[in-house]
A protein has these predicted regions:
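Outer-membrane beta-barrel domain signature, strongest for Gram-negative TonB-dependent receptors
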Residues: 1-76, 82-87
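Signature of Gram-negative outer-membrane beta-barrel scaffolds
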Residues: 76, 81-171
Length: 171
């Protein structure tokens, strides 16, 4: 099955005079979802995985541009920042057919070759292997573009600098 909750919100503020126009765009997104999959895709009761994630994303962009569209030199400059915080859990649940067919059969076949007469037993009908992830991502960008009209010609030049950082903690 699959369940999802998403919340999005944004805010825009603008300032304008006869020389410049400034705008600020702020957004927030919250995501909470849960997906359960039969990982072996067979009629046997092998194992399932459940992936649950909660994500918060915050962005901010500030844009400054000249306000007179009739000027020969048109320009735009801006800054963009974002942060994303993702917490994800992906537990895998081994069921009886998976324990016997994937784990015990393979393990006991190989243990018997090295230690004759010994083997492994898992009496449980199921067990869970937990996987927890924390994945923050941050980014920033600065940009500028200039357009100069030269008669019938239009000269455009721009530059953008992007920085991004991400990490992952796994338990």
């Amino acid at each position: 099955g699959y369940e999802r909750l998403t919340i999005n919100e944004g805010f825009v503020a603008r300032y304008h005079n006869n020389k410049i126009s400034i705008s600020s765009i702020t957004s927030y997104q919250y995501l909470d979802d849960c997906m359960t999959l039969d990982q072996d895709f067979s009629p046997r009761s092998m194992f399932t995985m459940q992936q649950m994630q909660k994500e918060h994303t915050l962005t901010e962009e500030i844009v400054i541009r000249n306000a007179n569209p009739l000027q020969r030199w048109q320009w735009i400059s801006g800054a963009f920042l974002f942060g994303k915080w993702l917490d994800m859990s992906s537990p895998v649940k081994f069921k009886r057919d998976g324990i016997e067919g994937l784990i015990l059969h393979n393990t006991n076949t190989n243990i018997g070759n090295v230690f004759p007469g010994y083997g492994l037993d898992i009496p449980n009908d199921s067990f869970v292997i937990h996987s927890e992830f924390n994945i923050p991502t941050y980014g920033a960008a600065l940009y500028h573009q200039s357009d100069i009209r030269l008669g019938r010609w239009n000269l455009t030049a721009g530059v953008r600098i992007d920085l991004e950082y991400t990490s992952m903690d796994y338990n």
